[in-house]
């Protein structure tokens, strides 16, 4: 899968736990890649993808969000989208 974020194409890659070295997800800014651990549940992978995307947005727009802010906003946005399926049609 590929995501276009702030004009850049990011490749989403699912990696082994060895490659992830204890991380669930990684935003690789210099490579335009998002790595997600392939050993996690689909729900955890989805959360990780949103989380890493928010890190990229924070960096691109100089928002300077800390880890806690990224975490809370990740869950808030997922809830918004899942609780309002018609939102994507607007």
Label the predicted regions:
Residues 1-44, 60-90:
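Metalloprotease/metallohydrolase-associated module, dominated by Zn2+-dependent proteases
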Residues 47-59:
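Active-site recognition of the HExxH zinc-binding catalytic motif
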């Amino acid at each position: 899968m590929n995501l276009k974020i702030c004009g850049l194409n990011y490749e989403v890659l699912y990696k082994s736990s060895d490659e992830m070295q204890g991380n669930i997800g990684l935003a690789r800014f210099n490579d335009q890649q998002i790595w997600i651990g392939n050993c996690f549940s689909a729900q955890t992978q989805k959360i990780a993808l949103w989380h890493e995307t928010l890190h990229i947005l924070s960096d691109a727009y100089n928002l300077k969000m800390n880890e806690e802010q990224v975490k809370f906003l990740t869950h808030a946005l997922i809830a918004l989208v899942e609780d309002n399926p018609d939102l994507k049609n607007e």
